[in-house]
Amino acid sequence: MTLRDWMRTFGEARSIDINNDLERGYEAALLIQTLELEYYGDRPIRPNLQLSVPRSLQSTILRKFHTAANICRLTFEAIKPNVSQLDSQEYRKYQLIETIVNRYAPKRSSRSTSISRAPDALPRSLLGLVDKVRRQLDPTSEATLVAGFRRRRDSTLISLKIILLLILVPLLVQQISRTYLITPAIDYLAPELPFLSYPKPQLEEQAVEKLRVFKAEIEFDALLKGDSIPSQDELQKALAIKAIQLKDEADKESTHAIKNVLADLAALIAFAFVCIINREELRVLRGFLDEAIYGLSDSAKAFAIILFTDMFVGFHSPEGWQVLLQGIANHFGFPARENFILLFIATFPVILATIFKYWIFRYLNRVSPSSVATLRGMNGSS
């Protein structure tokens, strides 16, 4: 192995260590934010503040906080020298860790505070410009940029691969299992197991309606051709033959629901299997989606939010929910009860809208205030 190979191996191992430390620190920072939101009213955690919870629970909260804060501090100190190697997504995680560390950093003495408040010899903007030029002139900057580009490219390829797997594998398993395994087995066992082809009221109603239409068609054809209307015995014989055909069709349709349930179950198992064996790829996909979503402009985020809300909880959403519920009922062999559909449409979109507004108020308002401002402006102008 040449020196270049050794250096490449060392660099990859170092990059993996940085990513692991960053993920651990980021999860600790999110834990602290969750504790702040749930127990301290979205304010900094104060160990000396008595909460309205049992003392044992408060001790557990403080123990989690101290552990997470220590992890954030160690992660911040470990990654700070290598911050120039982070991409945009990793840098956002680093910024969150830095915010938590600065928020809970021990307060300095009055003398150190006065010294820190003294004016700098050079403006910070000028120092930042000098540091930027220094990093650009660094001989290793090109290798760092290339490594970052390769990491982002690999992340994109892995994300596209896992998305295709999550979509195609369940669909293929569903169709193949239904066509070659489930359908032959159900058709073979249905005559011997009556519960597989149990009667359904909606199928009986459809069969009766088809039989009535068939009788009317016979009389209509006779009138068009100028023939005499079939006698009662001939009509009875034709209706009996048609009734047997309709019964066979209804028996076959009655097994479709069980076939659909078993095929959907097979697709769900395939989806879970893909998720289990591709845990690392799913973590990369989550980071890729975070970067794609947070990389959108404020107007694009507001547009996506308005599109989602108008589609699912907006003025025209009841018609869509009605079609969706009827399709689900037919897929699983349930009668499409109008009362249940109307009750669902009257309650579920309201609950969904409430959850969505709470998410905007508690989470999005803190993560992206400019997006919330743009959203309010677009709603106000519409």
Curated annotation (Swiss-Prot):
**UniProt keyword terms in alphabetical order:** Cell inner membrane, Cell membrane, Hydrogen ion transport, Ion transport, Membrane, Transmembrane, Transmembrane helix, Transport
Identify its membrane topology class: Multi-pass membrane protein
- The reply to whether Nucleotide-binding figures as a keyword in the UniProt entry is no
A GO molecular-function descriptor: proton transmembrane transporter activity
Q: Which Cys pairs does UniProt list as disulfide-bonded?
A: none
Any transmembrane segments, and where?
156-176, 257-277, 305-325, 340-360
The yes or no answer to whether the keyword Cytoplasm is present is no
Q: Which Gene Ontology cellular component annotation is one that this UniProt entry carries?
A: plasma membrane
| InterPro entries the UniProt entry points to | CemA (IPR004282)
| Pfam families in the cross-refs | CemA
Where is the signal peptide, in residue numbers? Answer: none
Q: Which domain of life is it from?
A: Bacteria
Q: What is its main location?
A: membrane
State its location(s). Cell inner membrane
NCBIfam families the UniProt entry points to:
PRK02507.1-4 (NF002705)
Which family would the database say this protein is a member of? Belongs to the CemA family.
Cited function: Required for H(+) efflux immediately after light irradiation to form a rapid H(+) concentration gradient across the thylakoid membranes. Together with PxcL, contributes to transient H(+) uptake following dark to light transition.
Q: What is this protein called?
A: Proton extrusion protein PxcA
Organism this protein belongs to? Prochlorococcus marinus (strain MIT 9313)
